């Protein structure tokens, strides 16, 4: 059994916990038992590809850790999962959830106070550490060495905040 398969199986046990923290209660749909879904037979999931190993596209299908979690939650609800890639800004702002575009968002989203004011989070299922990468032979050895330098980061992410 591969490590990815073992992790996926372990996450099946976490599906109810994940669901309790990330389902939008503002949707207009009904179905899935006591959970309101946009479409009664589908768990609509917003994500942002590419972000290996969490979510990325392969042969036109969104796959990865978050996709596996979405499938497990949908299976637990007795519905199918439909994953849609939207901009990370749409995830970060909560617009994907509040606009009725998705029931849940799964995209390796770091928990921040600003994000907690816009959406409910599940229990943390991945602890990330931020770092700035430089070439091995670089003279940069600390964040202070980057003062005034241009640093690349994805907009609206905790990585961007860290880089600032």
Q: Which sequence ranges carry the predicted segments?
A:
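Extracytoplasmic small-molecule ligand-binding "clamshell" domains
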Residues: 31-32, 38-107
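Bacterial signal peptide processing site
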Residues: 23-26
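Bacterial N-terminal signal peptides that target proteins for export
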Residues: 1-12
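Acidic, polar ligand-binding/catalytic clefts
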Residues: 71, 80-145
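Bilobed "Venus flytrap"/periplasmic-binding protein-like clamshell domains
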Residues: 52, 62-76, 109, 127-164
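Residues that flank catalytic or metal-binding motifs in active/ligand-binding sites
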Residues: 13, 41, 128
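C-terminal motif of bacterial Sec signal peptides marking the signal peptidase cleavage site
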Residues: 18-21
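Short glycine-/acidic-enriched loop or helix-start segments at secondary-structure transitions
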Residues: 55-57, 115-117, 162-163
């Amino acid at each position: 059994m591969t490590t990815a398969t073992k992790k996926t199986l372990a996450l099946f046990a976490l599906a109810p916990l994940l669901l309790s923290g990330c389902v939008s209660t503002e949707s207009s749909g009904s179905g899935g038992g006591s959970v309101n879904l946009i479409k009664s037979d589908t768990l609509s999931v917003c994500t942002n590809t590419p972000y290996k190993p969490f979510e990325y596209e392969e042969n036109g299908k969104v796959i990865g850790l978050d996709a596996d979690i979405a499938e497990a939650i949908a299976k637990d609800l007795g519905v199918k999962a439909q994953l849609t890639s939207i901009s990370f800004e749409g995830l970060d702002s909560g617009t994907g959830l509040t606009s009725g575009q998705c029931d849940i968002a799964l995209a390796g989203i770091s928990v921040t106070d600003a994000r907690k004011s816009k959406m409910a989070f599940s229990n943390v299922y991945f602890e990330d550490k931020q770092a700035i990468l430089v070439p091995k032979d670089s003279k940069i050895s600390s964040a202070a060495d980057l003062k005034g330098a241009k640093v690349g980061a994805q907009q609206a992410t905790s990585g961007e905040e860290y880089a600032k």
